[in-house]
Each structure stands twice: as structure tokens, then as C-alpha cells.
């Protein structure tokens, strides 16, 4: 079954993506993929991503910390799997290190 593309203007997409990012932490790549699903062109997508970062709707470091903490506590993922998933989402190495740093070594060993 083919994915149906919903076409939005950049203004409509910005409103929708703000709500989507406010609901839970998102990385830039997730937001970028969602904007392309809205049928936007590359220039519009990159402008909206820049605006979301400036407005602090998207923060890669905050995302990495939330992602790593959640996957470790809830899904019991190890650091290697968390790192692989963050890399797949194109999160920077700096942010990945920040995210993994919140996992307590004592808790990690006991898992």
C-alpha cells in the first residue's frame, strides 16, 4: 500500500510541525521526514527546520538525553543499541555522548 502524501503550504506545515514537536522530543531528521511527507520542497523544509531550532522546538541534545534515558529505563536497551539508533536518526556524536552520559553506570551494570 502506497503512502498518501498530504500537501500543505509552508505556513500550514509550520503550525502542524510545531504541535508535533511540542508533543514529544523530536530530532531534526524526524521533523525533516515529516515535512517531506507534507509535500514540501527542500528549501521550505530547511527553512522550517531552522525556525524550529531557533524557537527551541527542536533541540538535538535534549532529544538525545530523553531518547537515551527512555530507551534505557523502559526498553532496557544497552548503550550500543541506543548509540546505533541515535546515529540512524543522524544525531551528532556530541549529542550522543551527552545522551549516554545520563545513564548511571551502576544502573547500567545491574541491568
Give the residues covered by each predicted segment.
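An alpha-helical, amphipathic repeat domain used for nucleic-acid recognition
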Residues: 1-111
